[in-house]
A protein has these predicted regions:
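Short, charged, surface-exposed loops that flank catalytic or proteolytic processing sites
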Residues: 146-152
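Short Pro/Gly-enriched beta-strand edge/turn motifs at strand-loop
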Residues: 66-71, 154-155, 331-339
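Glycine-rich, aromatic-lined ligand/substrate-binding cores of catalytic
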Residues: 232-360
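Short, well-structured alpha-helical segments that form the helix of a local strand-helix-strand
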Residues: 153-162, 313-317, 463-466
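Substrate-recognition/cap regions that form aromatic- and gly/pro-loop-enriched pockets
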Residues: 322, 326-455
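Histidine-centered catalytic/metal-binding microenvironments
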Residues: 433-507
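Short, well-ordered beta-strand elements within core beta-sheets of diverse protein domains
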Residues: 140-146
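A contiguous strand-loop segment
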Residues: 3-136, 156-289
């Protein structure tokens, strides 16, 4: 039976009035568990390729699916051993999903609503197998092809959670051009969802994060909040609110879900809160002065000091506590402090995908997926249009084995070479990032202008033009990455321990 392994991710969500151009932006690092590396690929899924009857590899749950899926683009695992694991995607209706941010709920919640875990058959006692619920493997595949808006996505996901349950605690992001919703699972069948305020950013490590919930809104207009229909009764029946004491866990028509449902452990203070603190410190430095890397009350969402760009998101999701005593590549602090906390940009990142839905662009070309593979400290994201029938081979045809013919493995090789000589190779890494992002912005503007000038409105011609732009971006990435690999290899070769600074008389 396949093993269910937890992922380790970091998420940033940017409301449309907090972003530099009015877009909604949802972004997440997809990090494997310690000691594991998952190759990634960028693929487009046609309606005919979408299953009509779905069976989970990990939980064995079986679900009949609607017969009207739409096309969507995703960045899943290459290896099928743990199922599809779509991780990040945008459909042709400009709805985006990122799933999942692994979180944790406390033991009282798990006792009241246990996770729905696969129970293998007990042949000796004549008991058949009992399937588990849905999880990270399944969620995007079950939701994204069938929804027209982010709200619809929340409602479809909620129905699936309540019907089949889940075997793990997760945060799920769903967005469209107007709204971003963040869903957190509560035990096996319960859930809450909060809309990211338009003028704010949400910052989320691997920890249940929502820190304010308004039941009055959830059970009336649902403008900003949604939840399980019985959530208040669930809290009261199982005395979950009592754990909050005087800290605001339950107060009239609202509560602090982080206190009621979440955790605050010593591990959180090493693994989770420091990541939230660093994002907070970068986006809202004045207010962040009141918090430390181990604070339990770092806000789930904040109003950034400046409008947030794709470059800000890219930097943060590849960051490693730069400018602090906790930077593993830094010179501040001590050897202990530089390895005290888990950085955001980590060695086992599979990909970072930031999905930008632009209100000023035509519907056909509105959504862009900024994609990077491998450790974010040594690479950068590049823009790819989501509304396509096919994707570039350099990102699509990732092999299970190491190969410089694909972006994923090239980035992994460069990161491993550069890590040991961080400062000596930093110019090559930073120059690559600047060149790729600059080219990407120019390419998007040029493609947008070409579509507007041509006045193309028929779907096939627009899709073909977007695919051509994606190919051009991938070709540039490949050429620039090949040069970068050579530069980093040369520098690292000169710094090998067996190097000797003397040549024979003929050289």
């Amino acid at each position: 039976m396949p093993t269910i392994e937890t992922m380790s991710c970091t998420t940033i969500l940017v409301g449309k009035k907090a972003s530099y151009d009015g877009s909604t932006i949802i972004a997440r690092d997809d990090d494997s568990g310690s000691g594991r590396y998952d190759p990634k690929k960028f693929v487009a899924i046609a309606p005919k390729e979408q299953p009509r009857h779905y069976r989970s590899v990990l939980s064995h749950v079986e679900i009949d699916l609607p017969d009207n899926p739409c096309r969507y683009s995703i960045v899943p695992n290459v290896l099928p051993n743990r199922g599809i694991l779509a991780e990040a995607g945008v459909n042709e209706r400009n709805v985006a999903m990122s799933a999942t941010e692994t979180i944790a709920v406390n033991e009282r919640v798990l006792g009241a609503d246990p996770l729905v875990v696969l129970q293998p058959a007990d042949e000796a006692n004549g008991k058949p197998e009992t399937p588990g619920g849905i999880g990270e493997e399944d969620i995007i595949t079950l939701v994204l092809p069938y929804v027209n808006t982010a709200r619809e996505g929340v409602k479809r996901l909620a129905e699936l959670l309540e019907t089949y349950g889940t075997y793990e605690s997760n945060g799920i992001i769903i967005s469209d051009v107007d709204e971003i919703w963040y869903v957190e699972t509560i035990g096996g069948h319960h859930w809450i969802a909060r809309r990211v305020p338009d003028d704010k950013c949400a910052i989320i490590p691997n920890q249940l994060g929502i820190d304010y919930f308004d039941f009055d809104d959830a059970f009336s207009d649902a403008r900003e909040f949604m939840c399980s229909a019985d959530l208040q009764e669930f809290i009261e029946t199982h005395h979950l609110g009592r754990a909050a004491g005087t800290q605001g866990g339950m107060n009239g028509g609202h509560c602090n879900p982080r206190i009621v449902f979440g955790t605050a452990t010593a591990k959180d203070h090493i693994y989770n809160t420091p990541r939230a603190w660093y994002m907070y410190r970068y986006l809202d430095p004045a207010d962040a002065e009141n918090h430390t890397p181990e604070s339990d009350d770092i806000p789930w969402c904040l109003e950034p000091e400046n409008a947030v760009t794709v470059e800000d998101v890219d930097f943060l999701l590849g960051s490693h506590f730069e400018g602090t005593p906790y930077d593993p590549y830094g010179t501040q602090g001590t050897e202990e402090s530089r390895h005290r906390y888990r950085p955001i940009g980590i060695n086992r990142t599979g990909h970072m995908v930031a999905m930008q839905i632009r209100p000023y662009a035509p519907v056909e070309s509105r959504s862009i997926m900024w994609i990077s593979y491998g450790s974010g400290a040594f690479t950068t994201s590049a823009p790819f249009y989501a509304n396509v029938d096919d994707t570039p081979a350099y990102l699509r045809d990732t092999t299970p084995e190491v190969s410089t013919d694909c972006l994923y493995w090239t980035n992994r090789l460069i990161a491993t070479l550069a890590d040991a000589h961080f400062y000596e190779t930093s110019n090559a890494v930073e120059g690559f990032s600047e060149d790729v992002r600059s080219f990407g912005h120019r390419l998007v503007e040029r493609t947008d202008d070409a579509l507007a000038t041509a006045g193309a409105t028929d779907a096939p011609s627009v899709t073909a033009r977007l695919a051509a732009a994606n190919d051009e971006m991938a070709d540039y990435l490949r050429k620039r990455n090949t040069k970068r690999l050579g530069d980093v290899l040369y520098t690292s070769s000169n710094l090998m321990h067996n190097s000797f600074a003397m040549s024979d008389r003929w050289n």
